[in-house]
A protein has these predicted regions:
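Active-site-proximal cap/loop segments of hydrolase catalytic domains
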Residues: 515-713
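Extracellular/periplasmic ectodomains of large secreted or surface enzymes and adhesion receptors
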Residues: 341, 382-384, 389, 403-409, ...
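Glycine-rich His-Gly loop
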Residues: 118, 277, 416, 486-490, ...
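Short hydrophobic segments within beta-strands
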Residues: 116, 322, 369, 414, ...
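Cap/lid segment of the alpha/beta-hydrolase catalytic domain
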Residues: 144-157, 170-175, 189-192, 429-431, ...
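Secondary-structure transition/capping motifs at alpha-helix termini
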Residues: 133-134, 173-175, 185-188, 206-209, ...
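Conserved small/polar residues in nucleotide/adenosyl-binding loops
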Residues: 1-6
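Beta-propeller folds
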Residues: 14-19, 23-410, 416-422, 427, ...
Length: 713
């Protein structure tokens, strides 16, 4: 996005005076004022049907023509936003709220405890460690030193088993591409090792500290690094002190270009376990290799793609897996790799009536993280499967960042909910004592001023959908409150009740925040996911519309006072919802959305989403995709709600051309004075690693725009 001085209060004082007029945007008297987006006669034929794509030229991201379009759209949007006083009000709240220290849940290696910390002034959090039983902290990495604007971020770390070396990854300008480096933790200096073109990969160390496994792709074509398709991932071993060109190729399948690799070294150091995935499909295969053996071949333990299997740990030749095979809510099984036929598998922890999300091995116990109506519970089991107890941890919220080790009795995690900021806890399994070790302070936030509750409402087909609703206690529920409705609904991802300063800023301004836990997510296991994927995707949009209708019927707000927000798959949700039910919303905020459902699989990692969306090359899938694809369902000469589309130039997850094309077509179709704007951030990607100031600017612009539209309606 354009650069602006966030501390220039004079600009906002002038803007406030201008807003006295009913026609609050002085330069926006006509739809003709939008920057021109030319139409080109481009079309494809899908299954005998001609599909026109007049803005295909915007997919050429680096062309002079596209760059000129971006510049003019940003200038137009900035001119509009500069005259909205609510932006400054939101910015002030966020500046204050984020001007305070934050830290992460610690993780342990040997006697060192590592954690991220930000004093509130830094653009990026720094990595520190403390020695056990010592109070002195030591700085390990400061990503703020890597760029003047804070746009080079730390995107992954992995400590060697002896805690002497750190493999760390940096990402430039929000890209998913990672460059791995190695730091000596004693000297604080980097070795010469450098690994390029890694993506969707961690670093998994051998127990002898000699090196680590990682996944990488071939170097993309120059100039196409942010848009070329990512296939044929390969698994390598990097030996410390050697060049990347000498790294050993451990596994690759040229015959399976869409397979990806997740490597885990067993705690006893005897096995390399390979999670073999296909895109974002929750199902996976399991291969393993016996390390330090003469035969380096992989054994296909689970060769078929039939369910999810996540390696938890092992005891000798018995491997434990979390799986949803014949158990949509999840269970734990044991497989003897010397007797691996499925009829010999043993169930250790059976499926419960609520969703099992993760299983951890600690001090000879299994720690199971369940979601019960979207709130976290941790249950302790013997390795034989005998239930011991449900841990006495905070309730009615989200437990996140669970950190422990198989040989440790310490468990670290954080807890929060929509009106309780993050608190970090340590639980000692040896004496079953829970201790708070850090609490987030949010200036301006007072928990007693707010209320939050969970309600259930019926969707179009009668399914009960949970939703959290939060707001100031003293507001009157008179159908006149600015309402922010957020949703996602996809890829088995649960949206948990975590505290968010952006939601706090909305509530502080007198608004209501509602977060709907739509089908397609992981809140209630794999069946919940399947009810919102592929040919069932319309259920997600129906769930979202029903959430808005419920909130309107129960006094929280009304259509003209309701804004919807979603990002990525949630951006698709907002795009489809505003086109299907424009009558329900007074403003919309689609962020980094998947808007062209016929070409999403043509760029970077988009092909991987076919497991949730289907493929436009398949006729049956095409019929479903074309029916809801936001870009293809914009109707000419229609009055759509005020909309602020947001994306980033360096988003190589959901490439920005999705939003560019959607904005161009929406602006051409709009038949009334409701603005259709696009805000295009520079030096940023899909969201991860965005520096603090850019985050504040982004939220302020979005929520300030939305508040202004809703209060003007």
């Amino acid at each position: 996005m354009c650069i602006r001085d966030r501390h220039n209060t004079k600009r906002y004082l002038i803007c406030f005076c201008l807003l006295v007029s009913f026609f609050f945007i002085t330069g926006f008297d006509s739809l003709d004022d939008y920057p021109k987006s030319k139409k080109v006669d481009v079309f494809d034929i899908y299954h005998g049907q001609v599909i026109r794509d007049p803005y295909r030229w915007l997919e050429n991201l680096d062309s002079d023509e596209t760059q000129t379009w971006i510049r003019k759209q940003n200038q137009f949007t900035e001119k509009y936003l500069n005259e909205i006083s609510e932006i400054k009000a939101i910015e002030t709240i966020l500046d204050q709220a984020l001007d305070q220290a934050t830290r992460s849940v610690p993780f342990q290696e040997q006697s060192k405890y590592f954690y991220y910390y930000n004093n509130g002034d830094w653009q990026q959090s720094k990595l520190y460690y403390k020695e056990e039983n010592q109070g002195t902290e030591r700085l390990v990495l400061d990503p703020n030193q890597l760029s003047k604007d804070g746009t080079i971020a730390l995107s992954g770390v992995s400590v060697s088993p002896d805690a002497k070396l750190l493999a760390y990854a940096i990402s430039d300008g929000g890209s998913d591409w990672k460059t791995w480096k190695i730091r000596d933790l004693e000297s604080g200096l980097d070795l010469e090792d450098e690994i390029l073109w890694s993506k969707f990969s961690g670093a998994e160390w051998l127990k002898d500290n000699s090196g680590f496994y990682y996944s990488a792709y071939s170097q993309p074509k120059t100039g196409a690094e942010l848009e070329d398709t990512n296939t044929n991932q390969r698994l390598y071993f990097h030996k410390i002190g050697e060049k990347q060109s000498s790294d050993k190729l451990v596994y690759a399948r040229i015959d399976q270009p869409e397979w990806g690799w997740g490597a885990t070294v067993s705690e006893d150091g005897k096995y390399l376990v390979l999670h073999v995935s296909e895109g974002t499909d929750e199902r996976n295969r399991i291969f393993y290799q016996k390390l330090h053996q003469a035969d380096p071949s992989f054994i296909e333990l689970i060769p078929e793609l039939k369910a999810q299997f996540q390696f938890v740990g092992n005891e000798g030749n018995v491997f434990w897996f979390f799986t949803d095979l014949n158990a949509p809510m999840g269970r734990l099984i044991a497989i003897d790799i010397d007797n691996p036929d499925e009829e010999n598998w043993q169930e250790i922890i059976p499926e419960q009536n609520h969703a099992l999300r993760n299983v951890y091995l600690a001090s000879g116990y299994f720690l199971c993280h369940y979601l019960k109506d979207v709130s976290s519970e941790i249950v302790l089991y013997q390795t034989t499967g005998e239930k011991i107890k449900k841990l006495d941890v905070p309730k009615n919220g989200a437990i996140s960042g669970i950190s422990t080790k198989p040989d440790s009795s310490q468990l670290f995690f954080s807890f929060s909910n929509y009106i309780q900021p993050k608190e970090i806890f340590e639980y000692d399994l040896s004496d079953q004592q829970l201790k708070s070790i850090w609490s987030q302070l949010v200036p301006g936030f007072y928990a007693n001023d707010f209320t939050s509750k969970q309600e259930f409402y019926r969707s179009k087909d009668g399914t009960l959908i949970p939703m959290f609703i939060s707001h100031l206690k003293n507001i009157e529920l008179n159908n006149n409150n600015p309402l922010l409705l957020y949703g996602y609904g996809g890829f088995d991802i649960p949206i948990l009740p975590n505290f968010s300063t952006k939601y706090f800023s909305w509530m502080k301004m007198g608004g209501v925040v509602a977060v709907a836990n739509l089908r397609g997510g992981g809140e209630y296991g794999e069946q919940w996911h399947r009810q919102g994927m592929l040919h069932n995707k319309q259920n997600v949009f129906d769930d979202f519309a029903a959430a808005a209708e419920h909130l309107h019927q129960t006094g929280y707000s009304q259509p003209s006072k309701t804004v919807i927000e979603g990002r990525s798959n949630g951006g698709l949700l907002v795009g489809a919802s505003l086109l299907q039910r424009p009558d329900l919303f007074g403003a919309t905020l689609p962020g980094v959305g998947v808007m062209d459902m016929l070409r999403f699989n043509k760029f970077t990692i988009g092909w991987a989403w076919e497991s949730d969306y289907g493929s436009p090359e398949n006729k049956d899938d095409f019929e479903v995709l074309f029916k809801y694809s936001p870009y293809h369902n914009i109707q000419p000469m229609t009055c759509y709600p005020p909309t602020l589309i947001t994306t980033s130039e360096r988003d190589d997850r959901v490439v920005p051309s999705h939003s560019y094309k959607f904005a161009a077509r929406m602006q051409a179709a709009q038949s009334c004075e409701n603005p259709i704007l696009i805000r295009i951030e520079s030096r940023a990607g899909h969201g991860a690693g965005t520096p603090k100031d850019k985050v504040i600017d982004y939220i302020s612009d979005m929520y300030g725009f939305a508040l202004h539209m809703l209060t003007s309606n």
